[in-house]
């Protein structure tokens, strides 16, 4: 298995690394939140009777160790050390001021017995399980209402052994929605780093209703055929930084969400201030996706230095009548694509709904989406951008995009309005009007990228942006 040092070498070869001139919520380059990776108290899971043979079920050992460490929460927190070995377990809950540390060659294995993954209530912003009515199985590693939580180590592994769940999905024998590998809920101050995640039953890392989250230097792997094994899904969360990751899964690498139809509208918590940088991956779905569950709104999404290869699409926005909500102020730049079916895809009729209470008049607002500095080889189609009749997607801005496209019809656009500059092959008719100079204010941009614009000509502006 590739280690993160190898991935860093790949990034350097691609020349994608540079500290950005813009930031959203940190002083520079997604600086770490003030979290304590070093704790004054530490215990090993072996001190609580755990056996790392891959056969013994260690759920009680994890639960007892964390219960004991809770006594140090007001004393600087504590670290639970997981040494080399294969540590089979069912679901267990984290606590505040805890570092879960996996040593090199440590593997936390998810139990293949569904009884070891308890059923919990559905998320209020979804109203039911994502796959089935009713509850959902708790994630393997779970936390709720926490502060200052770290999952890290020396590139240890968390393996969900998801094939048993994928088979249930394919055979239609699920009783409840499948579990995620890691879910943190209503939590703030979260760091996940230097871990390899394998074979999630469902979405891999799911911060929901969270603030101040950093996910960096992680590898996420699942077979391309595995259903719905998204990599990282920030959901109704804010101030999220995802950087220096390699992801190869059976669904979206990153999927930004904020609730489902009327439940998400009523809950009303958006995802905002999402930074994604230095990401490499391949998928049977999208590199960076927004939706389709976006009913609480999604805004201030900034992504750069992205390499997507052997994938269905690079950028995708998914929504539908009945979703409501909005997607606005999205800025994606500096992407390299290789062997991608569709570079840019917006879908206005992604019609999955939780129940028959869906209000078809709850129309989403999709506006101010800027995509720039993109190159691609072996791309089948440049764009399939489909809005909603009577609810156009507006202020879609494309700049400095060069794609080697195989299709004779590179673009297909409907119910969309926007602008473009330096796009090859030439953008579709609704996007042909030039950005500069009249429509700069219609496009979303990072302020530092357009300062002193009034004193520049169009060529200089394009070079400096």
Feature annotation, model-predicted:
Residues 2-465:
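Extracellular/periplasmic carbohydrate-active domains that bind, remodel
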């Amino acid at each position: 298995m590739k280690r993160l040092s190898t991935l860093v070498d790949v990034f350097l070869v691609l020349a994608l690394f540079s500290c950005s001139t813009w930031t959203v919520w940190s002083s520079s380059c997604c600086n770490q939140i003030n979290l304590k990776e070093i704790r004054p108290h530490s215990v090993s899971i072996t001190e609580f009777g755990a056996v790392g043979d891959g056969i013994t079920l260690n759920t009680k050992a994890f639960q007892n160790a964390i219960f004991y460490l809770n006594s140090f929460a007001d004393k600087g927190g504590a670290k639970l050390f997981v040494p080399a070995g294969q540590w089979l377990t069912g679901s267990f809950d984290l606590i505040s001021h805890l570092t879960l540390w996996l040593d090199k060659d440590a593997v936390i294995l998810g139990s293949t017995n569904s009884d070891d993954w308890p059923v919990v209530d559905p998320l209020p912003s979804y109203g039911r399980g994502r796959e089935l009515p009713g509850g959902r199985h708790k994630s393997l590693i779970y936390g709720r209402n926490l502060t200052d939580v770290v999952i890290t180590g020396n590139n240890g592994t968390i393996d969900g052994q998801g094939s048993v769940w994928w088979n249930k999905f394919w055979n239609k024998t699920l009783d409840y929605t499948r579990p995620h590998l890691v879910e943190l809920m209503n939590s703030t101050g979260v760091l996940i780093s230097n871990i390899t995640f394998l074979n999630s039953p469902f979405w891999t890392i799911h911060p929901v209703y969270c603030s101040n989250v950093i996910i960096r230097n992680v590898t996420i792997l699942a077979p391309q055929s595995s259903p719905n094994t998204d990599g990282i899904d920030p959901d109704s969360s804010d101030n999220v930084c995802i950087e220096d990751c390699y992801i190869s899964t059976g669904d979206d690498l990153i999927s930004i969400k904020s609730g489902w139809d009327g439940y998400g509208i009523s809950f009303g918590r958006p995802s905002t201030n999402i930074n994604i940088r230095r990401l490499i991956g391949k998928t049977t779905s999208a590199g960076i996706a927004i939706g389709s569950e976006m009913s609480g709104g999604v805004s201030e999404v900034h992504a750069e230095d992205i390499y997507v290869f052997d994938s269905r699409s690079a950028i995708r926005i998914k929504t539908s009548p009945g979703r409501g909500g909005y997607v606005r102020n999205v800025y994606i730049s500096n992407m390299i694509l290789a062997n991608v079916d569709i570079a840019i895809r917006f879908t206005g009729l992604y019609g999955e709904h939780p129940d028959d209470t869906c209000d078809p008049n709850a129309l989403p607002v999709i506006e101010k989406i800027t995509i720039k500095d993109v190159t691609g080889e072996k791309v089948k189609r440049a764009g399939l951008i489909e809005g909603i009749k009577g609810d156009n997607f507006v202020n879609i801005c494309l700049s400095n995009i060069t794609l080697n496209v195989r299709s004779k019809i590179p673009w297909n656009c409907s119910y969309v309005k926007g602008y473009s500059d330096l796009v090859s092959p030439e953008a579709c008719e609704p996007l042909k009007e030039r950005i500069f100079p009249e429509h700069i204010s219609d496009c979303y941009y990072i302020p530092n990228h357009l300062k002193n614009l009034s004193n520049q000509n169009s060529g200089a502006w394009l070079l400096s942006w």
